[in-house]
């Protein structure tokens, strides 16, 4: 796949914050990803759906919401492991940020 300026413009459309204009009406460019990574619409929608319909702890209870959340969490971990070619999905650990991951 050849990456062109059109490719980047298509990707930018997925990130609502990157539609903003800043100083001198220029497109916002965000490079501080070690601190906070901007979210595409797909992530915002998934998070919103989770909080509205499935919000619960994982691996902590046997009620419906906890079971749904645990299943979704483990499916996501499996997908990430497959994408990264990791044999055991338990090696995939989600952390809140770079500092927590390093520590």
Question: What residue spans do the PLM features occupy?
Answer:
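Pyridoxal 5′-phosphate
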Residues: 1-103
């Amino acid at each position: 796949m050849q990456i062109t300026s059109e490719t980047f413009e298509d990707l930018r459309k997925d990130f609502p914050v990157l539609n903003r204009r800043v100083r001198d009406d220029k497109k916002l460019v965000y490079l501080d990803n070690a601190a906070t990574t901007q979210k595409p619409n797909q992530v915002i929608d998934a998070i919103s759906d989770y909080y509205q319909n499935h919000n619960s702890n994982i691996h902590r209870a046997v009620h419906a919401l906890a079971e749904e959340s645990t299943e979704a969490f483990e499916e996501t971990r499996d997908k990430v492991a497959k994408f990264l070619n990791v044999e055991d999905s338990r090696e995939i650990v989600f952390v809140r940020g770079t500092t927590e991951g390093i520590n």
